[in-house]
Design a protein with these regions (language model features):
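Conserved ATP-driven motor cores of ASCE-family P-loop NTPases powering translocation/secretion/packaging/pilus
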Residues: 96-169
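P-loop NTPase motor domains
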Residues: 1-97, 163, 167-169
Length: 169
């Protein structure tokens, strides 16, 4: 179905990615011609992050408090996050688990989306730091401010943002 899947591979490309991360090399996945195939996009991202989850949990637990043996901090950035974190999909991917649990394993989830209201509320509630630009939809504003103290005052600030301005919440 996908040209990138092979019945037999010469090496493990995920292991190569993990070695680059161990060497503190930044990795960017670009889906090229498969970028518009949502099922391929979710399959690859979910497969890769499940392996990352497994490796980081294992490395952190094997470190037994030895900071030098712990895995390097990792930030997983997901653009168009609603594709992975929408309420119907989030439960079937590893991203909800990462948002909830992996900070203690040196992994942070950084989500980017223009429609935060389409992201599962249980995931949004786990996001500690939020950066937002101007939002026009009331439900998107509500989603960004969910669980934030002083949300009423912040709502006014968000409504006054101009193009190219952001608010750190």
């Amino acid at each position: 179905k996908y040209g990138f899947l092979k019945p037999k591979a010469l090496d493990d490309s995920v292991d190569r990615i993990l070695k680059h991360l161990d060497a503190r090399t930044h990795i960017v996945l670009e889906f090229g011609r498969y970028g518009n195939m949502l099922d391929a996009y979710i399959f690859v991202a979910n497969f890769l992050t499940r392996r990352l989850h497994q490796k980081y949990v294992e490395k952190k637990e094997n470190a037994f408090g030895n900071k030098a043996a712990e895995p390097a901090p990792l930030v997983i950035t997901i653009e168009e996050a609603h594709k992975f974190l929408d309420p119907q999909i989030a439960g079937h991917t590893i991203f909800g688990t990462i948002a909830r649990e992996l900070r203690k394993y040196n992994v942070t989830l950084f989500i980017v989306d223009q429609r935060p209201s389409q992201i599962a509320p249980e995931v949004m509630s786990q996001i500690g730091t939020r950066v937002t630009a101007l939002l026009d939809e009331e439900n998107d504003i509500r989603a960004v401010l969910m669980g934030v103290s002083g949300a009423a005052g912040l709502k006014e600030v968000l409504a006054r943002l101009e193009t190219r301005q952001q608010a750190l919440i």
